[in-house]
Design a protein with these regions (language model features):
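Short, solvent-exposed loop/turn positions at domain surfaces
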Residues: 127, 209, 246-247, 321, ...
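A short glycine-rich beta-alpha junction/loop motif
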Residues: 11, 15, 94-98, 129-149, ...
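Structural detector for helix-capping/boundary residues
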Residues: 17, 29, 58, 119, ...
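Amphipathic alpha-helical segments
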Residues: 1, 7, 19, 25-27, ...
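DNA target-recognition patches
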Residues: 27-66, 71-86, 211-244, 279
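Non-catalytic DNA-recognition/assembly elements of restriction-modification systems
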Residues: 14-55, 185-207, 334, 339
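A short beta-sheet element
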Residues: 56-117, 126-129, 134-138, 224-225, ...
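Basic chromatin DNA-binding modules
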Residues: 3-5, 31, 125-129, 197, ...
């Protein structure tokens, strides 16, 4: 059981949310006062047949024969786009030099790990070119501590929530694998006819607009690459652009449309697709770097989630010499897929729709757990 303390107008050094068996103020320290050392990793040897894990800034990157580190450690990504990323480990291992190592003393290591999540190390990152966090910065960070017993209970509580989030993510991944297996099984059955996407649908180009067309509200929503969540519903609620520009009836998104990223500076993003659920209350279309595939056959929605589709995209992008990787409408319309007969297609559509609904409900639940964790981090630390 957790009790809430109204500390809004008090100056006691205690968290807002605390287990009831603990009392007394917390003491403030610098990280350097509660650690044996903070230093960069020194492991350099990769070995294909190494016995020990070699950790980089965001996880295991290989193996090594020379374990240089042991014990409870918190790892912090030191440089690059992932600067500030946290890991917690306890094993014989190697650690590379793009990672800072925190070895606490007389303090619960998990507690420090969760405190740094609460603290948000991104606030320390500096450098316009290559983002960087230094050991000196970490040493000066101030942390308030209760007793070791209280630290342990807070850390254990939050780790249980992390385990629940990990379990939820595993459920989501397993459902996605099940969906993919069903799709591949159906397309490889003997009840299919091979057709081009152009035989059962059409391609619509996105809207071209300029910065002068952008308005704050009461315009047409324009979906871009960042709104496409691969294999999931189109995200038309976050980070959207609204323009004061007329669109054709054909360009207005319709329920069941597939929105495709057709061009991007990153080739890995080209070809990703989302489906539109038809529930946006505003006029809505896609930008010039995206396209719309429209078909009256519901099962085509899942063709864009197959390995065959990904292979088509990969092959279409080979040989390009432009700065921006891109597809064209004909690339989409020429793609060939085995299409099951009407009766099987209807059964598959119902089954796959049910799995999609289950995936979305589990994603929603996982998001709620993550929000709960964010709230607890804000309330259980100072």
């Amino acid at each position: 059981m957790i009790t809430t303390i109204n500390n809004k107008h008090k100056k006691l050094n205690v968290p807002n949310l605390r287990f009831p068996e603990f009392s007394g103020e917390w003491e403030e320290y610098r990280i350097e006062d509660i650690t044996e050392n903070i230093s960069s990793g020194k492991s350099k040897c990769h070995s294909l047949n190494g016995k020990y894990n070699l950790y980089g800034s965001t996880g295991i990157i290989g193996k090594t024969d020379e374990p240089c580190y042991d014990g409870d450690l918190v790892l912090v990504a030191r440089v690059g786009a992932n600067a500030g990323f946290l890991q917690i480990i306890n094993e014989l291992c190697g650690i590379t030099d793009n990672t800072l190592i925190i070895k606490p003393k007389n303090v619960d290591t998990q507690y420090i790990y969760y405190f740094l999540q609460y603290y948000n190390l991104n606030r320390l990152v500096f450098g316009s070119g290559q983002p960087l966090i230094t050991g000196g910065m970490l040493k000066r960070v101030k942390v308030s501590l209760g007793t070791n017993k209280e630290q342990k209970k807070v850390a254990t509580f939050l780790s249980l929530l992390d385990e629940r989030i990990a379990t939820q993510n595993k459920i989501i991944e397993d459902l996605k694998k099940l969906k993919c297996a069903i799709i591949e099984n159906v397309l490889n059955s003997n009840h299919c006819t091979t057709l081009q996407l152009g035989d059962v649908g059409s391609y619509i180009r996105g809207l071209t607009y300029s910065s002068n067309d952008v308005v704050e509200d009461n315009g047409t929503l324009v979906m871009r690459s960042n709104n496409i969540v691969n294999g999931s519903p189109l995200d038309y609620k976050g980070d959207v652009v609204s323009v004061n520009k007329q669109i054709s009836q054909e360009q207005q998104l319709q329920n069941g449309d597939i929105v495709i990223c057709m061009a991007n500076g990153s080739s890995a993003l080209v070809g990703k697709s989302s489906f539109y659920d038809g529930e946006c209350q505003s006029p809505i279309t896609v930008g010039a770097f995206c396209g719309i595939y429209r078909s009256k056959m519901p099962i085509t929605k899942w063709l864009f989630q197959t390995n065959r589709y990904r292979r088509y995209i990969w092959n279409s992008l080979q040989g390009g010499n432009g700065a921006i990787a891109n597809l064209n409408g004909e690339d989409i319309l020429r793609m060939q897929f085995p299409i099951p007969d009407k009766q099987i297609a209807e059964r598959c559509t119902k089954l796959l729709s049910s799995i999609d609904s289950l995936i979305e409900s589990n994603i929603s639940l996982c998001s709620k757990f993550s929000l709960q964790k964010e709230y607890l981090l804000r309330q259980m630390f100072i």
